[in-house]
Every structure is written in C-alpha cells, then in structure tokens.
C-alpha cells in the first residue's frame, strides 16, 4: 500500500472531499461527509471488515449502483483517494487508542451562529445514522452478545432521530432522562469512548496501562516546603 494513503486529510482536502461528493451526478445519492465518517468508523469497528469494493459504492450512492461515479475519471480517482485516506486515518486513530475526531457540522441559528447547549448535540445525528447503516448492513455488531459492545453501541445509537430509533426509542428516552448529554463536546467525548470500547473488543485495541514510574529515593532530609498549595 502506497504511503500516500497513510497521509491524513488536511483542512483543504476535507473541503474538497465534500465538494466532490456533492458533485455526484443525478440520479445518484451520495453520502455527506459527516454521515460518511460514521459509516467508515463503524466499518472499522466490525470484527471482520468488508473490502473497500464492497462498501465504497454505498458512499457514492445510497443504492450502491455500480455506475455511480463523477463524470471526470480523474476527479473520481481523487474522490476515492480522499475517502480511502480518511478510512486509513480513522483506522490509525483506533489502533493507537486515540479518541476519534469525526467530521461534524455545527448547528447554526437563524443568524448563522453556532448554537450551544443541548441543541448543539443534533450535530452528531449524521454520524450516528452512518454508523447505524453499517451495523444494519453487515454482521458483527448489532447481533453481538457481548455486553461491552451492546453497552457501547447505545452511546452512539442514542443520537439517532426518534423516527428511526425503532426498538431503541424507549432505551433512548431513558438515557436522555437519566444521563442527558448537555452539549456537543460531551456528545463527541461520549461517542469517542463508545467507539474505543467497541474497537477494544472487536479488534483488540486495548489501551495498555503504563506502570507507574519509580520515584528516586531522597538522598537526605528534605526541608519543609512553604508557599501556596496547588
């Protein structure tokens, strides 16, 4: 695999990715980047990852029609490169046990200002929808009997809209009542922890506890320390 695929996307390339996706001609229905990020993240949480040839057509078109492509072959190649680099970047993040940093578009008020508080949490809905598509399309997560996986899935799927939550609607309501998410930052942190928990089970990406460093023994009597306490 070329090292170029290991290079994370920069800010301009994230914009380019969105522009190429929206340029997909009709009648095809491509994913939007924030939805796609949930989709890719879920793929990388599966115990058995499908090949790119199996999942990439769904990014270009909701029905995975095989002729879904940009009119310019060079632009199509570029789009596929950006998608795969994003996929590899998420994989590297998970493998290094670092929190994911998903593509999110903040919710804005009628003056174009980002909303705050509980209303801002709606920005993670596309991520949850993309994640949900994968677990409904491929085996390994939704059908899991592992308590850690099932509990962590709720941390993501609780953000599904009420009209698609299905059997989770009652559990979702209980979570919103007992453990409400107060803002977007908290939602992103909760999702990152949930994804890490799933990847720890399905792919063995457990963060290793580092042994405490031994402090050197004092060489002589220590003088009392004055000053403020921190």
Where are these regions (language model features)?
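Domain-length accessory/inserted modules outside core catalytic folds
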Residues: 1-128, 132-230
